[in-house]
Swiss-Prot record:
A molecular function (GO) term: translation elongation factor activity
Family: Belongs to the EF-Ts family.
Record flagged with keyword Chloroplast: no
Any one GO CC term of the record: cytoplasm
InterPro entries listed in its UniProt record: EF-Ts_dimer_sf, Transl_elong_EFTs/EF1B, Transl_elong_EFTs/EF1B_dimer, Transl_elong_Ts_CS, UBA-like_sf
Keyword Transport: no
Record protein name field: Elongation factor Ts
Key words of the record: Cytoplasm, Elongation factor, Protein biosynthesis
UniProt superkingdom: Bacteria
Species of origin: Listeria monocytogenes serovar 1/2a (strain ATCC BAA-679 / EGD-e)
Length: 294
């Protein structure tokens, strides 16, 4: 039997919003498998949805810039929100974005080795900034996109860089449309461009969960299939950009809005500061005791 810890129960509660005892039972029933426990709670109708993404817990900012042919979106992390709002930090982020746009390195490792206009490597430039600012700073990730002539980049930065989105549309040069789509992505956070992009494995998994959910609700077997079909269609439309109601005009979908310009969304990148990074949580008792001992 798997050892179910309080931390595992806490994590499952955060991901599903289910009660403590329900989470503990789910973990026991699934031998401590977190993903299976999420499915178990969903099938029982206890968890409304699986929040499988890691907690957002780091500071820093994203940035998006472009030129005639290329665009870059990147994330730079710092330890505190205070530093993230510092002018020196924001200038560093802008300088790193311009460097990556100019050099277009293939990887993060390559980016850190490139030489900036002042002769420093990117890594040395960051190290120097750490000394001046007094916090650990890191270039976490970036993506570079290239466009053809009859295309448009859309750039959108939300909440002073908390979220950065870069879109690429083909078949139109309308940057307003491209930016509107980027704004929508920042707000709604779709997983895919279209439902055709969803893997068969994900569809099969969701169908299995929805089927078990319907059966557990006591629905007759002869109508379960139709229920699952309807719920699956709704699920796919919710995670697919083109099928989502457009935030600026919910009467049409994003796909319909883009089609009016003669274009098509071919790619998008959405970075949210700290997603997938879990900040260290100090034990409250230990924190108090550490202060007492000083």
């Amino acid at each position: 039997m798997a050892n179910i810890t309080a931390q595992m129960v806490k994590e499952l509660r955060e991901k599903t919003g289910a009660g403590m005892m329900d989470c503990k039972k789910a973990l026991v029933e699934t031998e401590g498998d977190m993903e299976k426990a999420i499915d178990y709670l969903r099938e029982k109708g206890i968890a409304k949805a699986a929040k499988k993404s890691d907690r957002v817990a780091s500071e820093g900012m994203t940035h998006v810039i472009s030129n005639e042919k290329h665009a870059v979106v990147l994330e730079v992390n710092a330890e505190t929100d205070f530093v993230a709002k510092n002018d020196n930090f924001q200038q560093l982020v802008d300088a790193l974005a311009k460097q990556i746009l100019a050099v277009r390195p293939d990887s993060l490792e390559d980016a850190l080795k490139t030489e900036m206009p002042n002769g420093q490597t990117v890594q040395d430039y960051i190290t120097e900034a750490i000394t001046k600012i007094g916090e650990n700073i890191s270039l976490r990730r970036f993506e570079v996109k290239e466009k053809a002539d009859n295309s448009a980049f859309g750039e959108y930065i939300h909440m002073n860089g908390r979220i950065g989105v870069l879109t690429l549309l083909e078949g139109t040069t309308d940057t307003t449309v491209a930016k509107d789509v980027a704004m929508h992505i920042a707000a709604i956070n779709p997983k895919y461009i279209s439902r055709e992009d969803v893997s068969s494995e994900e569809v099969a998994h969701e169908k299995e969960v929805l089927t078990q959910q319907a059966l557990n609700e006591g629905k007759p077997a002869n109508i379960v299939e139709k229920m699952v079909e309807g719920r699956l269609k709704k699920y796919l439309s919710e995670i697919s950009l083109e099928d989502q109601p457009f935030v600026k005009n919910p009467d049409i979908t994003v796909g319909e809005y883009v089609k009016q310009s003669g274009g098509k969304v071919v790619s998008f990148v959405r970075f949210e500061v700290g997603e997938g990074i879990e900040k260290k949580e100090d034990n409250f008792v230990e924190e108090v005791m550490s202060q007492v001992k000083k």
